[in-house]
Amino acid sequence: NNKLTFNATNGQTTAAGIAAFHTSVTVKDGTFTSNEVSDSDGSINGVYGTAVGVTGADGSSALTITNSTFTSNKGTSYNQTEGGAVYQSIGTATIKGSTFDQNVAETAKEPTKNNASAMGGAVSLWGTTTVIEDSTFTNNSTASHAEKGSSLGGALYLRSGVWGGAENLSASIKNSTFDGNSVKGTSAQGGALYAKSDYDSEKDKHYILNLDLDNVTFKNNTSDSWGGAMFVQGEGSLKMKDVTF
């Protein structure tokens, strides 16, 4: 019966609510509302998660979110923004019975780099084995204001771990709904969901992300460019059962 509430906190670079490095985080019955994270002009990297940010290196980090709500959280960067509410890299991510509404990942109006990008309006996951069940993603958005920037995954951004993590990863989404999410910009991909399997040309190695959707509904999602509902690329597989567009 533990309850956790973050309301209108502010921070820089990583997660105004919870920031964790090389460890595991469990959130149960949490409420994260109107948290904001931004960086400064000329910053090196970008913004990674506004409510929760978990960074791993050896695959041991685990993020578990259950029966929680993330509303109106916002990340803004002059370089790149990943995860308007939640970010994790390398490890495992489990999200069950949770709601993500009106979260935003965007670049600054006048970004430092002309290729500044925004990924995952609600959630951004790099190099993670992922399970999402019984969850709702509504009215989340990503937007890149850079001339050559990308806007990827209005609600959810999934990517394999070319910079670490296992070579073969799975992402399972079950009994969930994506409604009214959007990506905006000159290169906008995946109004609700973006998933990519990477290739390391120097090592000639593929990093595979296999995506499995079961009883998932996509409706009213939009993209300025490609994939109004979802955009999937790379060597990984895509399996769909009882998916509604």
Describe the role of every protein-language-model region.
Residues N1-D41, G46-Y78, V86-E110, N115-A146, ...:
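Surface-exposed loop/turn motifs in large extracellular/passenger domains
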Residues G83, G190, G227-G228:
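The feature encodes a structural signal of leucine-rich repeats
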